[in-house]
Amino acid sequence: MRFLNNKHRAKGLKAEEEACEFLKTLGFEMVERNFFSKFGEIDIIALKKGVLHFIEVKSGENFDPIYAITPSKLKKMIKTIRCYFSQKDPNSDFCIDALIVKNGKFELLENITF
Protein backbone atom coordinates (compact mmCIF):
# COMPACT_ATOMS: atom_id res chain seq x y z
CA MET A 1 0.00 0.00 0.00
CA ARG A 2 1.27 3.43 -0.90
CA PHE A 3 1.45 5.99 1.88
CA LEU A 4 0.24 9.46 1.00
CA ASN A 5 1.66 12.65 2.38
CA ASN A 6 -0.66 14.75 4.53
CA LYS A 7 -1.33 17.33 1.81
CA HIS A 8 -2.27 14.69 -0.77
CA ARG A 9 -4.44 12.80 1.76
CA ALA A 10 -6.20 16.03 2.80
CA LYS A 11 -7.03 16.79 -0.85
CA GLY A 12 -8.39 13.28 -1.27
CA LEU A 13 -10.55 13.53 1.84
CA LYS A 14 -11.89 16.91 0.71
CA ALA A 15 -12.78 15.46 -2.69
CA GLU A 16 -14.54 12.51 -1.00
CA GLU A 17 -16.51 14.86 1.26
CA GLU A 18 -17.61 16.95 -1.72
CA ALA A 19 -18.43 13.73 -3.59
CA CYS A 20 -20.74 12.61 -0.78
CA GLU A 21 -22.59 15.92 -0.88
CA PHE A 22 -22.93 15.65 -4.66
CA LEU A 23 -24.21 12.06 -4.44
CA LYS A 24 -26.84 13.10 -1.87
CA THR A 25 -28.23 15.60 -4.40
CA LEU A 26 -28.69 12.66 -6.78
CA GLY A 27 -30.67 10.70 -4.21
CA PHE A 28 -27.93 8.46 -2.83
CA GLU A 29 -27.87 7.49 0.84
CA MET A 30 -24.38 7.15 2.31
CA VAL A 31 -23.84 3.71 3.86
CA GLU A 32 -20.12 3.72 4.61
CA ARG A 33 -16.91 5.56 3.78
CA ASN A 34 -13.37 4.29 3.48
CA PHE A 35 -14.09 0.58 3.84
CA PHE A 36 -10.72 -1.19 4.11
CA SER A 37 -9.70 -4.77 3.45
CA LYS A 38 -6.31 -6.37 3.00
CA PHE A 39 -6.82 -5.87 -0.75
CA GLY A 40 -7.62 -2.17 -0.77
CA GLU A 41 -10.20 0.47 0.03
CA ILE A 42 -13.62 1.48 -1.22
CA ASP A 43 -14.00 5.26 -0.93
CA ILE A 44 -17.80 5.41 -0.69
CA ILE A 45 -20.53 2.82 -0.35
CA ALA A 46 -23.93 4.32 -1.08
CA LEU A 47 -27.46 3.06 -1.60
CA LYS A 48 -29.91 4.17 -4.28
CA LYS A 49 -33.13 2.41 -5.26
CA GLY A 50 -32.12 -0.76 -3.43
CA VAL A 51 -28.74 -1.05 -5.19
CA LEU A 52 -25.43 -0.71 -3.35
CA HIS A 53 -22.95 1.45 -5.23
CA PHE A 54 -19.25 0.95 -4.52
CA ILE A 55 -17.76 4.26 -5.58
CA GLU A 56 -14.14 5.13 -6.32
CA VAL A 57 -13.52 8.88 -6.11
CA LYS A 58 -10.74 10.30 -8.26
CA SER A 59 -9.81 13.96 -8.47
CA GLY A 60 -7.29 15.96 -10.41
CA GLU A 61 -6.70 19.31 -12.03
CA ASN A 62 -3.92 18.81 -14.55
CA PHE A 63 -4.90 15.36 -15.85
CA ASP A 64 -8.00 13.27 -16.47
CA PRO A 65 -8.55 11.37 -13.20
CA ILE A 66 -10.39 8.49 -14.89
CA TYR A 67 -7.02 7.15 -16.06
CA ALA A 68 -6.11 6.47 -12.43
CA ILE A 69 -8.73 3.69 -12.38
CA THR A 70 -6.85 0.81 -13.95
CA PRO A 71 -7.85 -2.84 -14.46
CA SER A 72 -5.59 -3.64 -11.50
CA LYS A 73 -7.47 -1.11 -9.34
CA LEU A 74 -10.81 -2.61 -10.38
CA LYS A 75 -9.61 -6.12 -9.49
CA LYS A 76 -8.62 -4.86 -6.02
CA MET A 77 -12.01 -3.21 -5.66
CA ILE A 78 -13.78 -6.47 -6.54
CA LYS A 79 -11.74 -8.36 -3.93
CA THR A 80 -12.56 -5.66 -1.37
CA ILE A 81 -16.26 -5.86 -2.28
CA ARG A 82 -16.13 -9.62 -1.66
CA CYS A 83 -14.69 -8.89 1.80
CA TYR A 84 -17.48 -6.38 2.41
CA PHE A 85 -20.14 -8.93 1.50
CA SER A 86 -18.50 -11.54 3.72
CA GLN A 87 -19.32 -9.20 6.63
CA LYS A 88 -22.65 -7.80 5.38
CA ASP A 89 -25.73 -8.99 3.46
CA PRO A 90 -24.32 -10.95 0.50
CA ASN A 91 -27.65 -10.87 -1.37
CA SER A 92 -27.63 -7.16 -2.23
CA ASP A 93 -27.61 -5.97 -5.82
CA PHE A 94 -24.54 -3.83 -6.44
CA CYS A 95 -22.48 -2.00 -9.02
CA ILE A 96 -19.07 -0.35 -9.18
CA ASP A 97 -19.02 3.36 -10.02
CA ALA A 98 -16.43 6.08 -10.45
CA LEU A 99 -16.96 9.65 -9.38
CA ILE A 100 -14.59 12.01 -11.17
CA VAL A 101 -13.88 15.41 -9.63
CA LYS A 102 -12.07 17.79 -11.95
CA ASN A 103 -11.85 21.57 -11.66
CA GLY A 104 -14.79 21.63 -9.25
CA LYS A 105 -17.08 19.61 -11.54
CA PHE A 106 -18.46 16.14 -10.85
CA GLU A 107 -19.08 13.28 -13.24
CA LEU A 108 -20.60 10.01 -12.05
CA LEU A 109 -19.76 6.99 -14.19
CA GLU A 110 -22.03 4.14 -13.18
CA ASN A 111 -21.34 0.43 -13.54
CA ILE A 112 -17.75 0.66 -14.73
CA THR A 113 -15.95 -2.47 -15.92
CA PHE A 114 -12.67 -3.36 -17.55
UniProtKB/Swiss-Prot annotation:
One of its GO terms (molecular function) is nucleic acid binding. Transmembrane segments: none annotated. It comes from the Bacteria. InterPro entries: Restrct_endonuc-II-like, tRNA_endonuc-like_dom_sf, UPF0102_YraN-like. PANTHER family: UPF0102 PROTEIN YRAN. Belongs to the UPF0102 family. This is UPF0102 protein HPSH_02690. It comes from Helicobacter pylori (strain Shi470).
